[in-house]
Every structure is written in structure tokens, then in C-alpha cells.
Amino acid sequence: GLWQKIKNAAGDLASGIVEGIKS
């Protein structure tokens, strides 16, 4: 549902931030 899409988007954003910090 919509909530799952929102959680997925938030997870992708968090992963991108983490990758940015590690690199």
C-alpha cells in the first residue's frame, strides 16, 4: 500500500545518506 511505498522511500533515502557518509 501507500504506507509501504513511503517506508521504502524513507529506507532508500536513509541508505543513500549512510552511503554518502561512508564514502
Swiss-Prot record:
Coiled-coil region list: none
Keywords: Amphibian defense peptide, Antibiotic, Antimicrobial, Secreted
Expression by tissue: Expressed by the skin parotoid and/or rostral glands.
Location of the protein in the cell: Secreted
Keyword DNA repair found: no
GO biological process: defense response to bacterium
Cellular compartments per GO CC: extracellular region
Family assignment from sequence similarity: Belongs to the frog skin active peptide (FSAP) family. Caerin subfamily.
Record's function text: Antibacterial peptide, that adopts an alpha helical conformation which can disrupt bacterial membranes. Each caerin displays a different antimicrobial specificity.
Name assigned to this protein: Caerin-4.3
Lineage: Eukaryota, Metazoa, Chordata, Craniata, Vertebrata
